[in-house]
Amino acid sequence: LWDQCSWIIETVSEKLELKQAIFKHLDESVPTTIPIGSNSSGFPISKIALGLKTAQRMMGAHYFMPAEVVPLVEIVLGEKTDPAIAQQVCQLYREVNKKPVLVKKDIPGFLANRIQHALMREALSLVEEGIASPEDIDDAVRYSFGFRYAAVGPMTQKEISGWDGMANAAKEI
């Protein structure tokens, strides 16, 4: 049974006790050479794997919906996750045309959701302050940097346009 298995991922509903029970069972029954992941959207992997004997092989593996279309998978290191095992899992995802990103600390919201929520907080603030309509905010994102970010991320874009210019503009914003 386990000879053909290179990775296990849990995808049950967001109930911490359920995830912990499944991880406890996997910890006890799955060969220690097989990494185990959780697709949790919010629970830290360190909480899910708390007290387990083989927590070094456990990590978050957060997909984005629809998972069959969106290539990103966040690989989230828990407090005890072995980074070398996480790199092996990243390679498995690359082999199936997914784009893994390594989140080196087990923080709430992981990486992409934190960036998304920062944008949403500012968008809601602009609507609440009467600066723009929701439709205009959507258009501002869709027809400017949203379109551009599909080609290059924010860090690469600033590298291209110049960090000094961004720093000067940020003083005014």
Give residue ranges: language-model regions.
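Rossmann-like NAD(P)-binding element
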Residues: 1-35, 43
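Short acidic capping loops at alpha-helix termini that bridge into adjacent secondary structure
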Residues: 4, 32-34, 55-57, 135-136
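N-terminal alpha-helical segment
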Residues: 19, 68-72, 119-120
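Rossmann-fold dinucleotide-binding core
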Residues: 35-113
